[in-house]
Every structure is written in C-alpha cells, then in structure tokens.
Amino acid sequence: MLRAVSTSFGTARAASAVAKKNMPNIVLVDAVRTPFVVSGTVFKDLMAVDLQKEAIKALVEKTKLPYEQLDHIICGTVIQECKTSNIAREAALLAGVPDKIPAHTVTLACISSNVAMTTGMGMLATGNANAIIAGGVELLSDVPIRYNRNARKAMLGMNKAKDVPSKLKIGGQIVKNLLSPELPAVAEFSTGETMGHSGDRLAAAFNVSRREQDEFAIRSHTLASEAAKNGKFTDVVPVFLDGKKPKTIKEDNGIRVSTLEKLSSLKPAFVKPHGTVTAANASYLTDGASAALIMTEEYALANGYKPKAYLRDYLYVAQDPKDQLLLSPAYVIPKLLDKAGLTLKDVDVFEIHEAFAGQVLANLNAMDSDYFCKEQMKRSGKFGRVPMDKLNLWGGSLSIGHPFGATGVRLATHSAHRLKEEKGQYAVIAACAAGGHGVGMLIEAYGK
C-alpha cells in the first residue's frame, strides 16, 4: 500500500492510506459552476465561450487568486464552435486572464472536464505547474449545423469554375442541397446507435424495469430540489444577462419533482413502442459551465488557501461501444478501489453520472452480479452493491442537468462538499461517456 505524509491547513497530520509515495498531494481548492439550465431557455442567446468565461471569472474572484500564481488553464467541451475551437484560451482572455498564461481545450464526450482535471493533476504531479484551473462547458442551445457534404463540395468547387455554364451548374448543385443540412451526430460513429437506444437495451439486459427507472428519476429530482432549497449548491455562481430586459440567473432551472403516475404515462423516447427510456428518466439537453482550482497541497498552504479535498487518484476505462457503451461505472469503480487498496465499505460518498436512470441502475446491478463480475471482469465473485444511502444524495444529472463538458467538475465539487457535510473520508466519482469510455476518480476529505 502506498503511503505519504499529508498535511491539513497549516499543520501536519497522519499519513493517508491512499496517498502516492514520492508524489505531491494534489488538492481541490475550490470550484464553481454557472446555473445548469435547460437548453433553449435563459442562455439561448449566449455562446459557450461566454459561459466558460463566467465560470473562470467567478472562480478567480471567489478564491481571490492572483494571476501570478496561475500556471495553466484546461477546459473540456464536446460540441465545438469553430470560431472558438480552443475555447479554454478564448474564455480565459475574455475573463481577463493575462495572455502569458497558456490555456488549452480537451474533449472526451461526457467526461471532458474530468479529462481537464486529470490532465491538470498530471502537470501538478510532475512539477510542471503549481496551480491550474480546470473546467468545462457546453451550450446546446446553439450547435453547429452545416450544409451537407454535396453542398460543401459544390461551394468549394465554385472557386475553380472558369466559365458561366460551369458556375451555373455548380450553383444548381448548391441550391439542390441547401434544404438537407447536417445536424451534430447523436449516434455513435462506430455503431450507428444512439445512446438512448443503448440505454434501453442495457436496462433490459440487467432487468431494470420501467417503474424502477421512473422511481429513480423522481428520487433524483426530489433530492436535488431538497438540496437546492437547503442551500447545498454553494458552487453555483450567478450569471448576469444584459439586454433590453437585464436579469441575473441564479439557479438551475431543470429540477422538476413529479409523480410516478405522470412519469408512467410518458411514451418511450427511443425504442418504440416497448422501450423503457423516456424523456423523464433520461438527462436533458443542458447549457452550463464549470471551473475548479487545483494545486499541489504544498503550494496551496504556502499561499494561504484552505483546500476542500484531496484528488487522490483516477482511472480511465474503455469497452465495447456496441453492447457495453454505458457500463463504464461497473468496470471502473472496482478497478479504482482495487488500485487504492480500498473496499466498497470504505467509500462514504458515491457520485455516479446519471445519463439515464436505467443506466445507473444497470451498473449497480452489474457490480452486484456474480455472473457479470466473473465473466466480464474476471473477478472471483460479485463486487457488491453501491448503497443507495450513499449515492447521489443531492440529485444528479437527471435533475440538475448535464452540460457534457462541465459535469465532471460538478461531480467532484459535490463529492467534496458531501464529504465535509456527511463527515466521510472517501468519495468515488464514476461516469460513462461516448465510445464506451468511462472515468473513476477517488477523492479524500481534507483534514479528516
């Protein structure tokens, strides 16, 4: 088991069982997010870069971070705007960050801001930085819709046309294809299947009923509503919208507590007519951004910061995107805990990304299945079941929302805050992503 000496705020403390030998402790100093809102609503007139700017700016103000202490900025995003292809850099400049501080953008579907965080962790661990802002953003109110390929080829060919007949011919091809635009892909490139279809098949494979999915969705919205009312979402920062009717957006707007009767009346959204995934038990299109300040513990303490949590370890996994697209949590949680020398019982807080209610419940069933764990994970037996009284107690992506590039930081922040409130020691984050990818992160309470 790896051990290293850790310190609490200004004072030495006992060694942590999961700290890595001969490597600096990495800490989450603080994090923020804009309100997560339903796409097409209050943020519909903004660009993604505007939201990421707001998150970075708010984080700097909240932490009182002097720019001379900041080494690098990393942001994740999925559906990119061509004008801001390196959105991290553009957002940083708009936020007033000095142009001498580098910034780059990463992407890995729904775990893009996890990649931003772990990339930063690597830079900190190797001594290439002391302080990094890691975040992410998605704005699905406005996505790049382009002309189809035939129209694009014709447009590019127009420059080579040398006479009027040739130009008229190419012009006809352009006009012919104008009414067939290409929307951003919603299906897996390798399989042609949408995530919703995959979620439906996964729920069926692991015997998750429609009722169980609807009940889990109601649970998510109910817990998120209670958390919001009780002031738990201290990571949310307001966004001021200028215009003819200026207003300030202060809270998430997709949390809606409903009843089982209402949810059961909805028709399947993907596999018709007998599917079980509906608009209510799936996460919705969301606009939002997040940003986290991470440092080495030594640097944080030397400069007067009080960290919220240790970022102890992480692990990425990948599997068959056809049959196991959304099963990453079931693979990564056992592997991550094995790597850390911990057991299921050692974990006090779980934050699992809720792409679909059925996806979360299927992963819980998979980890509690002798057959799955023996056949697919080559374990001696089932790993065990994640207790519901430790899982997503402030709601999750089903209720709070899921801006693809921003969710990872939200998961880390809620884990850190829950550890403090619940007086726990270890938290585990797990999330699936397109391509059959997944991530797990191990977080330890600071000063525990």
From Swiss-Prot:
Which cellular compartments is it found in? Answer: Mitochondrion
Q: Which residues are catalytic?
A: 110 (acyl-thioester intermediate), 402 (proton acceptor), 432 (proton acceptor)
GO MF terms here are: acetyl-CoA C-acetyltransferase activity
SUPFAM superfamilies found in the cross-reference section:
Thiolase-like
Q: What is this protein called?
A: Probable 3-ketoacyl-CoA thiolase
- Residues annotated as signal peptide: none
Reaction equation(s) it catalyzes: an acyl-CoA + acetyl-CoA = a 3-oxoacyl-CoA + CoA
This protein's record includes keyword Methyltransferase? no
Return the CDD domains for the record: thiolase (cd00751)
| GO CC, one annotated term | mitochondrial fatty acid beta-oxidation multienzyme complex
Keywords assigned by UniProt, alphabetized: Acyltransferase, Fatty acid metabolism, Lipid metabolism, Mitochondrion, Transferase
Fetch the Pfam families from UniProt: Thiolase_C, Thiolase_N
Task: Output the InterPro entries linked to this UniProt entry.
Answer: Thiolase (IPR002155), Thiolase-like (IPR016039), Thiolase_acyl_enz_int_AS (IPR020615), Thiolase_AS (IPR020610), Thiolase_C (IPR020617), Thiolase_CS (IPR020613), Thiolase_N (IPR020616)
Gene from which the chain derives: hadb-1
Give its E.C. classification number: 2.3.1.16
Asked if the keyword Signal belongs to this entry, the reply reads no
Q: Which GO terms describe its biological process?
A: fatty acid beta-oxidation
Pathway note:
Lipid metabolism; fatty acid beta-oxidation
Indicate the family of this protein: Belongs to the thiolase-like superfamily. Thiolase family.
Biological role: Mitochondrial enzyme that catalyzes reactions of the mitochondrial beta-oxidation pathway.
